[in-house]
Regions:
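Helix-loop-helix hairpin linking two adjacent transmembrane segments in secondary transporters
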Residues: 90-137
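Conserved MFS/SLC helix-loop-helix module at the cytosolic interface between two early adjacent transmembrane helices
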Residues: 12-48
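A late C-terminal transmembrane helix in Major Facilitator Superfamily
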Residues: 274-311
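C-terminal transmembrane helical hairpin of 12-TM major facilitator-type secondary transporters
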Residues: 225-270
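Helix-to-loop junctions at the C-terminal end of transmembrane segments
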Residues: 13-25, 212-223, 306
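Cytoplasmic helix-loop-helix junction between adjacent transmembrane helices
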Residues: 56-94
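Extracytoplasmic gate region of multi-pass secondary transporters
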Residues: 161-202, 206-212
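Cytoplasmic membrane-interface "Motif A"-like loop-to-helix N-cap segments
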Residues: 23-33, 220-233
Length: 337
């Protein structure tokens, strides 16, 4: 439920956040979002009940949706027409990198001091980030030419493309989440200890921190994003479907991270192709509203498959199917273009 409290604002506020871009700057909105993340941490520090923890998660969720939308827009503004896929990959991979650092650092802080110190550290980090963005960030000069009067609403063709791009991103992320949720169970069924199984599955997340940027660089250099995407999806699907062959588990997890998850930046680059620059703030709000609505049910469907069959492999087959439909959705996006 606390996880849901964090994600709920994304469904409700993504579109209004897109509206907000008409009235204030990206810099101020990101600063406010980071401050909300810090405030959520403060509420968690002083929380003494479930309701207070839920409130902390909601406040953090508000900050998350604002920063997600406008960090994406800021990167798009700076790198549109340049090495956009690479830049988007670096942005996207910063999230699992932060999670990985938190998993290590926060556990150490909690063991050395108190569990509240993890929230203290995260809140301080967000405050420093807010200060840095507010004091240092400047909109690129070329963006000023078309963002001084950002427009609300999207023409029908841009709305269609934005929803399709969101579908591609949502299916891709949903497949990854299902893999993280049920991959270890497949390995445990094959004889691994739970701790070892979780460590092997996590290898994909570690290597994708580097493979995403490399894949984005290759896409920007050779200008073949669709070919690269389909090759990566094929590798990802193969690694998922072969996961029950647990003697190859390490290699399959590495393959999934190195190849299957590599095209994240390539997919996020679709956002700039779906909408005009002066409608980007609102359009990315639409993009993430659709993303949250589409991706949220996937873990529940995977859980239902597991509960119904008692076999952890079926959710993995579901994840592979989601990756297959990523390719289909991308093809429809190109057709609609």
């Amino acid at each position: 439920m606390l996880i849901g409290a964090f994600l709920l604002p994304g469904v409700v506020l993504a579109l209004p956040c897109g509206f907000a871009g008409r009235y204030t700057s990206d810099r101020l909105l990101v600063t406010v979002g980071l401050v909300c993340l810090a405030l959520g941490g403060v509420v968690a520090i002083i929380a003494t009940s479930f309701n207070m923890f839920a409130l902390a998660r909601i406040v953090c969720g508000i900050g998350f949706v604002v920063t997600t939308i406008y960090f994406t827009k800021m990167v798009a503004d700076w790198f549109d027409g340049k090495e956009l896929a690479t830049a988007m990959a670096v942005l996207v991979m910063s999230w699992p990198f932060g999670i990985a650092m938190g998993q290590v650092g926060h556990v150490w802080l909690a063991a050395l001091f108190d569990w509240r110190m993890a929230f203290v550290a995260a809140s301080i980090y967000c405050c420093l980030g807010a200060l840095g963005v507010f004091c240092v960030y400047r909109m690129p000069t070329h963006a000023n030419d078309h963002t001084h009067s950002p427009q609300l609403g999207l023409p029908s063709n841009e709305l269609t493309l934005t929803l399709l791009a969101s579908l591609v991103w949502a299916l891709f992320n949903a497949g990854y989440i299902v893999y993280l949720s049920f991959g270890a169970s497949v390995l445990v069924n094959g004889g691994y200890e739970p701790t070892g199984a979780a460590a092997i599955i996590s290898l994909a997340s570690w290597v994708m921190l580097f493979s995403g940027a490399i894949c984005g660089q290759i896409s920007d250099r050779f200008k073949k994003p669709d070919t690269i995407l389909y090759i990566c999806l094929a590798g990802g699907i193969a690694s998922l479907l072969l996961l029950p062959w647990t003697q190859f588990a390490v290699g399959l997890s590495l393959l999934f991270g190195l190849i299957g998850m590599a095209p994240a930046g390539v997919i996020m680059a679709l956002t700039t192709q779906a909408m005009a620059p002066h409608r980007r703030a609102f359009g990315i709000g639409v993009f993430f509203t659709s993303y949250f609505l589409i991706s949220t049910p996937a873990p529940g469907i995977a859980g239902w498959l597991f509960d119904t069959t008692g076999i952890a492999y079926w959710p993995i087959v579901f994840a592979a199917t989601l990756f297959l439909f990523v390719g289909v959705a991308n093809a429809v996006f190109r057709y609609a273009q």
